From Swiss-Prot:
Modification Phosphoserine, positions: S54, S68
Protein name: Apolipoprotein A-II
Family statement: Belongs to the apolipoprotein A2 family.
Assembly and binders: Monomer. Interacts with NAXE and NDRG1.
Protein task: May stabilize HDL (high density lipoprotein) structure by its association with lipids, and affect the HDL metabolism.
Recorded name of the encoding gene: APOA2
Keywords per UniProt: Cleavage on pair of basic residues, HDL, Lipid transport, Oxidation, Phosphoprotein, Pyrrolidone carboxylic acid, Secreted, Signal, Transport
InterPro entries reported in the protein's UniProt record: ApoA-II, ApoA-II_sf
Subcellular location: Secreted
Segment forming the signal sequence: 1-18
Organism: Macaca fascicularis
Statement: the UniProt record of this protein carries the keyword Secreted: yes
Amino acid sequence: MKLLAATVLLLTICSLEGALVRRQAEEPSVESLVSQYFQTVTDYGKDLMEKVKSPELQAQAKAYFEKSKEQLTPLVKKAGTDLVNFLSYFVELRTQPATQ
């Protein structure tokens, strides 16, 4: 029993000392964190610009946009037609009671 109590006491003291050491440790300043963040964003932007310059990626993007345009054009035309029909239905409803 004494061994168990001593073990628990030792673990408690060690965890408290660890917490104390963590509190006393120097925290990184906000300026260094912001500087590191901007450096990372800048590096990422440079890498992205290098990747965008490749002709293969440009060809893939162009093919994607052309395919999207081919697929969306009929949908947009149908949506426009449906909208005109929908609005004309309400215009006809409004003019109908006036003629009766």
